[in-house]
């Protein structure tokens, strides 16, 4: 894929059966937990994108032996803990990776220095560093905890921590640090977030206690990791990533005559908010062949071209679909009426300011968008937008893929300026979409 640009053009119907790449969240965690565990962990279906490979290299730097045995098949020999790295840990663009790794590293009496690419160096890490500091870790770095920074861990105290925002990354960092904290840890969530860390800790042999408790008219989720948990290597089958499956599925919904099935998609209820929302918009979206793999429910999803209508997305749904709002906004651009997306301020501190970039990209393609501090409103006419724009992505893979999907059904082609970053989460995106019949070419 050219770094200079990539463009998509309207064409015929999209048809076919494909598999989504492995889930990025579970792929990161399989590497980290495998390195923390004692013994052998085998992984199948790993997402071999740039972000996960950066996490794999980091685990090697912390002393784990990691080998690739085939496409998506990896073996991790863990030593039951981390060794002090001899060089700086470069996490590339992997925000999930660096935040979880810092949590894991905080449990060991050593120093580790972390950096990343330009985008990651601009993202604040304070939300993770604050609870780690309360547990006894120390750090030295730039303003608001921006990378590069050095973390010194060891001798951690237990912590009862209420998340100030819905963040699975912060929760996971505290839980991973809690593996080596005196007294264990408890994380209290005001809104339930993706629970892959809890599920996978159990799969590796740890005890994790999850309880929902009422406080007034609100329910809080309490996640407790008792002291002294040990991890043992296991087998991980990585399901298809619902965030990646969203792109071919939405493409099928907006390109006339299309029918696309994505097999093996994870259906964890804390990750499927987009599919619920699309069905509320009138999408012909059918889930079949539901089964369980490595503790996660998976299934096949078929999408057929649909006339969509605007909806109000409940703000409390945001944690279950925070990465999918850019592609939801594309679907909304083809719907009739307003689609209101609020309570998504978290989008502004992702790989880019995704609220502004999504709004600006859609506006450039002729879509009516109102940007708000914590969200945006997209008004569609029920007809294809005009397209014909080059969208500025600031190197954000989800912004790039979302607008390329728009171009497949717009009145004129749409180009994106930095498609190279798509490899962070969906390295086979262009080939998969071409295989379904899409027109994609270098810009």
UniProtKB/Swiss-Prot annotation:
According to its UniProt record, this protein's enzyme class is: transferase
Which positions does UniProt annotate for phosphoenolpyruvate binding?
24, 95, 123, 169, 354, 398
Q: Name the source's superkingdom.
A: Bacteria
Q: Which UniProt keywords apply?
A: Amino-acid biosynthesis, Aromatic amino acid biosynthesis, Cytoplasm, Transferase
**One Gene Ontology term from the biological process aspect of the record:** chorismate biosynthetic process
| Enzyme active site | 323
Annotated catalysed reactions: 3-phosphoshikimate + phosphoenolpyruvate = 5-O-(1-carboxyvinyl)-3-phosphoshikimate + phosphate
Which Enzyme Commission number(s) are listed?
Answer: 2.5.1.19
* Pathway it works in: Metabolic intermediate biosynthesis; chorismate biosynthesis; chorismate from D-erythrose 4-phosphate and phosphoenolpyruvate: step 6/7
Query: Where does the protein end up?
Result: Cytoplasm
Any single GO molecular-function term of the entry would be: 3-phosphoshikimate 1-carboxyvinyltransferase activity
The residues that the entry says bind 3-phosphoshikimate are: 24-25, 29, 167, 169, 323, 350
Q: Which Pfam families did the record assign?
A: EPSP_synthase (PF00275)
What GO cellular-component annotations does this UniProt entry give? Answer: cytoplasm
Task: Please report which protein family the annotation says this sequence is part of.
Answer: Belongs to the EPSP synthase family.
PANTHER family with a match to the protein in the record: AROM/DEHYDROQUINATE SYNTHASE, PENTAFUNCTIONAL AROM POLYPEPTIDE
Q: What does this protein do?
A: Catalyzes the transfer of the enolpyruvyl moiety of phosphoenolpyruvate (PEP) to the 5-hydroxyl of shikimate-3-phosphate (S3P) to produce enolpyruvyl shikimate-3-phosphate and inorganic phosphate.
On assembly, the entry states: Monomer.
Extract the HAMAP family matched here.
EPSP_synth
Name the chain's protein. Answer: 3-phosphoshikimate 1-carboxyvinyltransferase
Organism name: Caulobacter vibrioides (strain NA1000 / CB15N) (Caulobacter crescentus)
